[in-house]
């Protein structure tokens, strides 16, 4: 049983959709119909007006950094493509970017910024701490910096931390309303409410809470972010959102047919269930996972109140790889270890998407109890 925090188990209706006749996305009009339906469904999950999903260059939606439209796009590539594409589309030499971080992916934004010639200011806390909001205020108030873009992560998957991005967005807007905001919501979107209407580029991916296979990076993009992209020379062809804003004359490259069909089907299941019901299911699964973990003497990496409804990271100092291997070999349950410096000390349970069910969590924790 696959219980990692992405990729997740893919439900049978999605697998069935993937097995149907393969169509050519470059010449078959049916593909455009599927892609349009996919972006409409994505818009519903993002919480923006489907009429503004941008497939023909349209705009509209519930308000951009509170008042602009949001267009929704889906690029062919894993979720990291979205992070790099956001930077590649907005950053050029000299662009000042504030990277707010308390984990691996927050720091990764700074690496992307520097690789495209931007000036990254990393405002960071330790991976088991909240976002450093006081340090954010200090950075925003510093006279020597005039930030163009700010980046942050909603759910730091390696530590299972759900960040208070609302407070960070408030402080950025109060300090300088012109700063464009980029948020990695890859492991929260679909399982946790995300304030997309306050974010200029909100990033998602197919293999997390949507429970489709890896292969698509999604984004909801504001009008002012599009304007910033159009005002600069492109520094990349593939990692570039702009060609996807208007696909009325075709896609910039051959799209990933099977992945588009799969995500469309997965989003259909999610919306049929209802966003509120899906989020309640994630909360219930997370609560059961932590309750069962506490019974086994396991502690979460962040404080429980900062743990994400989509993933639980348990402390397992020096034992994570051993426990992971025994679970796989003895019980056919697959969990993830930590990443980076925490790789050997953290064991992660992904209760997101199709896996956000109490019965699946109970089966997982029963297996974990047997090997501890």
Question: Could you say what each language-model-derived stretch is?
Answer:
Residues 1-54, 58, 63-73:
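A glycine-/small-polar-enriched, mobile loop at the entrance of the PLP active site in fold-type I
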Residues 196-207:
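Conserved active-site segment immediately N-terminal to the catalytic lysine
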Residues 347-372:
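PLP-dependent enzyme catalytic core of the Aspartate aminotransferase-like
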Residues 10, 207-291:
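Active-site C-terminal subdomain of aminotransferase-like
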Residues 131-186:
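Active-site phosphate-binding strand-loop segment of PLP-dependent enzymes
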Residues 39-40, 69-99, 105-110:
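Conserved beta-loop-alpha segment that forms the PLP phosphate-binding cup at the N-terminus of a helix
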Residues 299-330:
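Conserved PLP-binding catalytic core of the aspartate aminotransferase-like
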Residues 89-146:
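PLP-dependent aminotransferase-like
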């Amino acid at each position: 049983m696959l219980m990692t925090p992405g990729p997740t188990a893919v439900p049978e209706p999605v697998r069935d959709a993937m097995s149907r006749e393969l169509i050519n996305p470059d010449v078959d009009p049916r593909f455009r119909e599927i892609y349009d339906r996919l972006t409409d469904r994505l818009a519903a999950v993002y919480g923006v007006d489907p009429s503004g999903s941008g497939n023909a260059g349209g705009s509209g939606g519930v308000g951009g950094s509170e008042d602009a439209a949001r267009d929704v796009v889906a690029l062919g590539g894993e979720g990291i493509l979205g992070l790099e594409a956001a930077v590649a589309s907005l950053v050029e030499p000299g662009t000042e970017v504030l990277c707010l971080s308390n984990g691996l992916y927050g720091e990764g934004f700074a690496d992307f910024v520097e690789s495209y010639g931007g000036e990254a200011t990393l405002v960071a806390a330790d991976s088991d701490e909240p976002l450093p909001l006081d340090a954010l205020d200090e950075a925003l108030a510093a006279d020597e910096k005039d930030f163009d873009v700010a980046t942050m992560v909603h759910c730091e998957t390696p530590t299972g931390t759900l960040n208070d991005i609302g407070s960070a967005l408030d402080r950025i807007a109060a300090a300088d309303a012109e700063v464009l905001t980029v948020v990695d919501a890859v492991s929260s979107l679909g399982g946790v409410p995300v304030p997309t209407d306050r974010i200029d580029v909100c990033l998602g991916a197919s293999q997390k809470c949507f429970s489709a296979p890896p292969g698509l990076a999604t984004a909801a993009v504001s009008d002012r972010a599009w304007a910033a992209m159009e005002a600069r020379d492109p520094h990349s062809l593939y990692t570039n959102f702009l060609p996807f804003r208007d696909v009325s004359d075709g896609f910039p490259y051959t799209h990933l047919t099977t992945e588009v069909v799969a995500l469309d089907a997965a989003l259909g299941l999610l919306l049929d269930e209802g966003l509120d019901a899906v989020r309640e299911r994630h909360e219930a699964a997370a609560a059961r996972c932590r309750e069962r973990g506490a019974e086994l003497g396991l502690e979460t990496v962040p404080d429980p109140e900062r743990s994400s409804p989509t993933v639980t990271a348990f402390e397992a100092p020096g034992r994570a790889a051993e426990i992971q291997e025994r679970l796989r070999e003895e019980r056919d349950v697959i969990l993830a270890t930590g990443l980076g410096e925490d790789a050997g000390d953290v064991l992660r349970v992904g209760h997101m998407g199709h896996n956000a069910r109490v019965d699946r969590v109970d089966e997982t924790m029963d297996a974990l109890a047997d090997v501890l």
